Amino acid sequence: MHGVLAVFTAVAMLSGCAGDRDRSNDPRATPPWLYEKAQDSIKSTNYTNAIFFLEQLESRFPFSDEAKQGQLDLMYVYYRDGQFESAIDAADNFVRENPTHPRVDYAYYIEGLSHYDPSRGVLERLFRVDTTMRPPVGALEAFTAFSTLVDRFPNSEYAPDATQRIKFLRNRLARYEAHIAEYYIRRGAYVGALRRLHRIIETYYGSDSTYWALEMMLESYRELGLGDLAADTERLLEENAHLKNSKS
């Protein structure tokens, strides 16, 4: 009996969803109604329905009071549904069209998250495998989005979490550059190595590869016979002694 009731309940719920979708195409469907249905779907984690209602709201009522909040909700739902590219596109569009909106910080946050999650990869997330020797797909974009958020909106409620993610990404991106620099150094290609080492210092300063990069710069300058630059690098090593032994 309980099984029969469960089946009837599921059928009724599906019928209700279908009915709401049918009504969304009715000219009498209003922005508040579409937004309410989207919120109900989000609360029940029915992201497919939420996306449907929010997309209807955006396409049919772009100038309604609910439209802007609907756009923010839509990028969130795309992200939660694993549609990262759609979330990134929605966030980019929102930032471009609403640069002074009071919640534009949230758009940067969602953009960063949508690049960040895929950038870590399944092996790294599940088995803690070091994937820093592989190209960090999405990591640089996530780093840029989170950095923009923290720089432009230091008091944002999303800034603390973004800051923690920046630390992780800074280390990851720097380690990737370090692997390439090591490859060049092993082959005596010191000019190529220096390009990567400079990037670690200039772009990812404070990462756990910073002091190591300075040491490798010193070695490279000496190998190239560039005494003045080697001396400058020695001074930088002294100034950054607090970062010694940070590279694992």
Regions found by a protein language model. Name each.
Residues 1-17:
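Sec-dependent bacterial lipoprotein signal peptides
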Residues 16-248:
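Acidic, polar-rich low-complexity tracts and alpha-helical solenoid repeat scaffolds
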